[in-house]
């Protein structure tokens, strides 16, 4: 369904004529060690890192990779020589790669009254289980729908995605205990993890014509997504649905 355009030097937010968000300046944590985050504005995984840094009030420099499809910056290649992907958190002379690894690192390196990961071992295990589910089965099913070659295959794969979303809906209903988020009253590790599907789901809904988040099957996730987008730690970094769709059109030559 979505054919990747290998060479496109017009994928920056400025080129798409989308208003560039201002970098939020946050309070220092008392350390003089430099903190940088390398990301791309439309990357759901970079958004995870930005939300974690915001929640922990970590002052940092955000470095935008403006054209990751055409080429990678020297800083990105040096900081993540194995995968050469965003996000990368640079803390002094240490580079931390992979979004969930970064979220956990931020939570542990800047202790505060607000903990991203739960403190109880059983709840931490629950959070890590669903993080693995999202980055494994759920994203695999999203990618499968996006890459379907025909309508028949797409409908079969859409059923698999809906099953995975139904499982996530059940987890939300059990863990939220009537609150707005997976952890109850405030966003935490599972919310930050699941937040990475908001953009991709919006894009495949737009291109496939299939609604995956539906009031009859995922009412909790629909309300959760609205609350998550509006949260003060998320809103400055989360692109709108229209922005995600416009980016996908450029990226996949649609």
From Swiss-Prot:
Q: Which residues bind glutathione?
A: 43-44, 71-72, 85-86, 98-99
Is Nucleus one of the keywords? yes
Q: What is its main location?
A: nucleus
Where would I find the GST N-terminal domain in this sequence? 33-114
Q: Which GO terms describe its cellular component?
A: cytoplasm; nucleus
Question: What does the record list as GO biological process?
Answer: glutathione metabolic process; toxin catabolic process
Subcellular compartments: Nucleus
Please identify the protein, giving its name as recorded. Answer: Glutathione S-transferase U12
Q: What is the lineage of its organism?
A: Eukaryota, Viridiplantae, Streptophyta, Embryophyta, Tracheophyta
> Coding gene?
GSTU12
């Amino acid at each position: 369904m979505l054919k990747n355009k290998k060479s496109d030097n017009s994928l920056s937010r400025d080129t798409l004529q989308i208003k560039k968000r201002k970098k939020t300046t946050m309070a220092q944590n008392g350390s003089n060690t430099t903190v940088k985050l390398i990301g791309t504005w439309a990357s759901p995984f970079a958004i995870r890192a930005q939300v974690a840094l915001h929640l922990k009030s970590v002052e940092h420099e955000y470095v935008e990779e403006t054209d990751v499809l055409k080429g990678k910056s020297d800083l990105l290649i040096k900081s993540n020589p194995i995968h050469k992907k965003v996000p990368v958190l640079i803390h002094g002379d240490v580079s931390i790669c992979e979004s969930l690894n970064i979220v956990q690192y931020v939570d542990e390196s800047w202790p505060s009254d607000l903990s991203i990961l739960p403190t109880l071992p059983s709840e931490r295990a629950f959070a890590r289980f669903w993080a693995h589910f999202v980055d494994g089965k759920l994203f695999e099913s999203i990618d499968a729908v996006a890459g379907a070659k025909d309508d028949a295959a797409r409908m079969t794969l859409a059923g698999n995605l809906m099953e995975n979303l139904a499982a996530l809906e059940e987890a939300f209903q059990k863990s939220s205990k009537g609150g707005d988020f997976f952890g109850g009253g405030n966003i935490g590790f599972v919310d930050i993890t699941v937040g990475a599907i908001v953009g991709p789901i919006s894009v495949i809904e737009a291109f496939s014509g299939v609604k995956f988040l539906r009031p009859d099957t995922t009412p909790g996730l629909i309300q959760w997504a609205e609350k998550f987008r509006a949260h003060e730690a998320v809103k400055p970094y989360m692109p709108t649905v229209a922005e995600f769709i416009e980016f996908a059109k450029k990226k996949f030559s649609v």
